[in-house]
């Protein structure tokens, strides 16, 4: 079976008393196990989109890979994020300066059947001139894809939110490093 991979990463400044990171974590904790049906996945991703739409996104990265490398790309994104979360030292108690410069990183990845209506949605919505790939407007458009997908044609999906509870997230310098590979959006 041939697939297409779609991945989006967005980062926004972690602000004291801003509930967004907590709301994302609560959504994942509450709905992660119970979103196996097509309808449940549709509702879940609609809620993820609704939360991320309110985020003041500063950095981002995205990719659409169709064909032979799609499944490898999905697995690579997932394993790199999972291994970084597992090996990232606990940053609890870090300095106030670190906390004030910390970001929340949200990543969404999808593996869809090649040629399906979900794949066509990705093709239509990701047909963006290269000069516009890294703008806030483009990322708003990319996030809006989540609730549009027909999850009957989505073979795998995942969402990650870093940092976890009581931890500082990556800094702007870390986000643009080769480890993260994000770009400051225009």
Where are these regions (language model features)?
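Alpha-helix capping and helix-coil boundary motifs
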Residues: 33-37, 69-70, 78, 127
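Membrane-proximal, solvent-exposed terminal domains/tails of membrane-associated proteins
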Residues: 10-12, 79-186
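N-terminal topogenic membrane-targeting module
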Residues: 1-65
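Charge-rich, low-complexity amphipathic helices
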Residues: 46, 66-67, 164, 168
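Short, solvent-exposed polar/charged micro-motifs at secondary-structure junctions
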Residues: 19-20, 70-71, 167-173
């Amino acid at each position: 079976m041939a697939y297409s991979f779609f991945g989006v990463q967005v980062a926004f400044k972690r602000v004291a008393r801003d509930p967004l990171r907590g709301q994302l974590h609560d959504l994942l904790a509450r709905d992660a196990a119970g979103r196996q049906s097509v309808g449940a996945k549709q509702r879940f991703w609609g809620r993820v989109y609704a939360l991320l739409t309110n985020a003041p996104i500063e950095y981002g990265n995205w990719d659409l890979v169709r064909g032979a490398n799609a499944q490898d790309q999905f697995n690579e994104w997932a394993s790199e994020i999972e291994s970084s979360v597992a090996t990232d030292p606990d940053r609890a108690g870090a300095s106030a300066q670190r906390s004030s410069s910390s970001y929340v990183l949200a990543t969404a990845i999808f593996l869809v059947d090649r040629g399906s209506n979900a794949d066509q949605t990705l093709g239509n919505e990701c047909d963006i001139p290269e000069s516009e790939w890294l703008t806030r407007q483009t990322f708003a458009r990319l996030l809006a894809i989540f609730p549009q997908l027909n999850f009957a044609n989505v073979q795998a999906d995942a969402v990650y939110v870093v940092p976890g509870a009581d931890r500082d997230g990556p800094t702007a310098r870390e986000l643009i490093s080769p480890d993260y590979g994000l770009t400051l959006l225009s």
